Regions:
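Hydrolase catalytic cores
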Residues: 1-2, 12-20, 40-44, 130-132, ...
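Structural recognition of the beta-strand scaffold that forms the well-ordered cores
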Residues: 4, 10-15, 48-52, 81-85, ...
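Short acidic, glycine-rich surface-loop motifs adjacent to enzyme active sites
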Residues: 14-16, 34-62, 85-86, 199-201
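C-terminal domain-closing interface element
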Residues: 32-53, 339-360
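Catalytic cores of secreted or luminal carbohydrate-active enzymes
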Residues: 49-50, 67-97, 350-358
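Extracellular S/T/G-rich loop segment that most often corresponds to the catalytic His/Ser-adjacent loop
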Residues: 92-179, 183, 188, 198-199, ...
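Edge beta-strands of jelly-roll/beta-sandwich modules across compartments, strongly enriched
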Residues: 178, 204-215
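A glycine-anchored, Pro-Gly-centered beta-turn/N-cap motif
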Residues: 190-194
Length: 360
C-alpha cells in the first residue's frame, strides 16, 4: 500500500485559480490562498504546515519580492511551517550573471529557437549602478543605449518588437529591474543569436543577474549561451523563513541535477535540505498511481516531516513552541549528508537529506 509521510493528517486543499495560457496563476492568487489557509488555522486553533509546490522566476531572487516578503511576515502568524520546492531549473539555461566594473563592457548572448511565440528577460542590478544597455538582433542591428525613464519604451528590430521597462527600487528592495519583452511583429520572435550588451558608466558594486521565464514556457534551444547553475532557485524558495526543499535521487543517493541551486547573492544559505524527487510514486486524479519527478514531489516529504514534528511537539504536548524556524532548525540538525560532498551546508543540498521520512 502506498502512503505518505504523515498519512493521517487532515488536508485543507486550496485551488489557486485558473492559469492563463502560457502563464501561471498570479502572485496575488497565491497570497490569497495562503491567507485563507492561515485564517482557517487560526479559526480552528490548530497547527498547520503549508506545502507550496509552486515557483516562478519573476523577481530579484534575493528574498525581497512581494510574495516572499508576505510569506516571511505571515510565517510569524500562528503555529505554522511553510515548505516550498527549489524548482527544476538547475540544469536549464535560464540564468546568467556576473560583475561589471566601471568602463568595462559585458556581452550576454541569448539563443532564441525557431517558432518562439514570445519571451522576456529580466535584468536585475543595484539601483546605484549606472550601465549603458544595448540590444542586438541576429542580423546585427542594434538599439541603445536605452533611456532610463518611466513608462514603456518600444523598439523594433527586424520582425521583433521590444518593449522595455525600467523599474525603480521599492519599499522592500534596493534593486532595479530592467524588463525586456520580446514580441513578434507577425507570428514568431526572430530566431538566432541575440545579444544584450552592458557598459559600466558609474559603477559601485557592479553585480548583475538575468533570468528567463521557467516552467517549460520556452521552446527547447532557447536560453543563455553561458548559463549559471547557481542562483536557479525559483521564487518563493529564496524567502528567508520558508523551508526550502531540493530534490535528490534516492536510488543512487545523489543530487538531482535539475534541482534549483542557491547562490552567494543571498545573505543566508538555501536550500535547507533535500528529499527524494526522482521517480516518485504519486496518486493521479481519478484513481491509480504514476511515477513523477521534480522538486514539487520532494517538498511534500518534508511537509509531512514538519507535520509529524509539530504533532509531537504541539498536539502531544511535548513542545508547544515547535513551529516556524524551530521546525526548520530540527530538520536541519537531523539531516543526513549525501555521498560526494565534503562541505556542509552547501547550495545544492543544503544540510542534507530529511531523515524523518526514513522512519515511516
Amino acid at each position: 500500500m502506498n502512503q505518505g509521510v504523515a498519512c493521517e493528517s487532515d488536508l485543507l486543499v486550496v485551488k489557486m485559480g485558473i492559469p492563463r495560457e502560457n502563464s501561471f496563476p498570479r502572485t496575488t492568487e497565491l497570497i490569497q490562498g495562503i491567507d485563507y489557509l492561515v485564517r482557517q488555522a487560526l479559526a480552528m486553533g490548530r497547527p498547520m504546515v503549508i506545502n507550496l509546490s509552486f515557483g516562478n522566476n519573476y523577481g530579484s531572487h534575493k528574498g525581497d519580492s512581494l510574495l516572499e516578503t508576505y510569506i516571511d511576515m505571515v510565517s510569524s502568524t500562528g503555529r505554522l511551517a511553510i515548505c516550498t520546492g527549489t524548482g527544476n531549473n538547475g540544469n536549464q539555461p535560464l540564468h546568467e550573471g556576473g560583475t561589471l566594473k566601471q568602463g568595462q563592457t559585458r556581452q550576454i548572448e541569448l539563443s532564441v529557437s525557431s517558432r518562439e511565440p514570445t519571451l522576456n528577460v529580466q535584468l536585475w542590478k543595484s539601483y546605484e549602478d549606472e550601465m549603458s544597455i544595448y540590444i542586438e538582433n541576429p542580423s546585427g542591428n542594434r538599439i541603445g543605449p536605452l533611456d532610463e525613464k518611466l513608462g514603456p519604451q518600444r523598439y523594433r528590430l527586424g520582425n521583433t518588437e521590444l518593449l522595455i521597462y525600467y523599474g525603480k527600487p521599492g519599499p522592500y528592495h534596493l534593486t532595479q529591474e530592467i524588463y525586456i519583452d520580446f514580441l513578434p511583429v507577425e507570428t514568431y520572435v526572430d530566431s538566432g543569436d541575440w545579444k544584450i550588451i552592458l557598459s559600466g558608466k558609474r559603477v559601485r558594486g557592479g553585480e548583475y543577474y538575468l533570468w528567463l521565464p521557467g516552467g517549460n514556457t520556452l521552446n527547447r534551444g532557447t536560453g543563455f549561451y553561458e548559463p549559471r547553475a547557481y542562483g536557479t532557485l525559483t521564487i518563493p524558495a529564496t524567502a528567508r523563513r520558508v523551508i526550502t526543499v531540493g530534490a535528490y535521487d534516492s536510488l543512487v543517493d545523489s543530487y538531482a541535477d535539475f534541482s534549483g541551486r542557491g547562490s552567494r547573492m543571498l545573505p543566508y544559505l538555501k536550500p535547507d535540505l533535500v528529499a527524494p524527487g526522482v521517480n516518485i510514486v504519486a496518486p493521479v486524479p481519478g484513481g491509480g498511481y504514476r511515477t513523477v519527478t521534480g522538486t514539487s514531489f520532494a517538498t511534500p516529504f518534508v511537509s509531512g516531516s514538519a507535520a509529524l514534528l509539530m504533532q509531537w511537539g504541539i498536539v502531544n504536548g511535548n513542545d508547544p513552541y515547535l513551529y516556524g524556524e524551530k521546525v526548520k532548525a530540527y530538520l536541519r540538525k537531523g539531516a543526513r549528508p549525501l555521498t560526494g560532498y565534503e562541505e556542509y551546508p552547501n547550495e545544492e543540498v543544503g544540510w542534507g537529506e530529511d531523515v524523518i521520512i526514513r522512519l515511516h
